[in-house]
Amino acid sequence: MVYCENQFGLPDGKTAAALVRHSELYSIVGIIDSSLAGKDAGEELGEEKSGIPIFADLNDALESLSYTPDCYIYGKAPLETFIPIKERLLILEAMMKGMDIISGL
């Protein structure tokens, strides 16, 4: 699961976009970006339908999937030099649900 709130398909969401396009290490099962919820990640990148859904939030994703993904990937490159408090709380929520956290920051 890749978190990319309000940035998927934009320059600050390049990590998430790259993972949707190609990943040998991770199986991407969804993107979290409430501004694009209900859409297909591949189509939002101007490509073919990928079958990777975009969810409003983690709870929406977990309700739609029949399992909890192994990883929660922070797929944004924020302008700030730190992860904002609100997003840190979302990371903690994913940890409490048993997900490993992956971040390139």
Predicted features and spans:
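N-terminal beta-loop-helix "entrance" segment that forms/cooperates
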Residues: 26, 34-53
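Short internal beta-strands
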Residues: 27-35, 102-105
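N-terminal phosphate-binding or glycine-rich loops at protein starts, especially the Walker A/P-loop
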Residues: 1-25
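Generic hydrophobic/aromatic pocket-lining and core-packing "Φ" positions
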Residues: 16, 87-91
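Beta-strand-loop-alpha-helix segment that lines the small-molecule cofactor/substrate pocket
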Residues: 90-105
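Glycine-rich, highly charged phosphate/nucleotide-binding loops
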Residues: 46-65, 83-87
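N-terminal glycine-rich "phosphate-gripper" loop used for MgATP/nucleotide binding
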Residues: 70-88, 105
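Short glycine-rich anion-binding loops that position phosphate/pyrophosphate groups of nucleotides
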Residues: 7-8, 37, 76-79
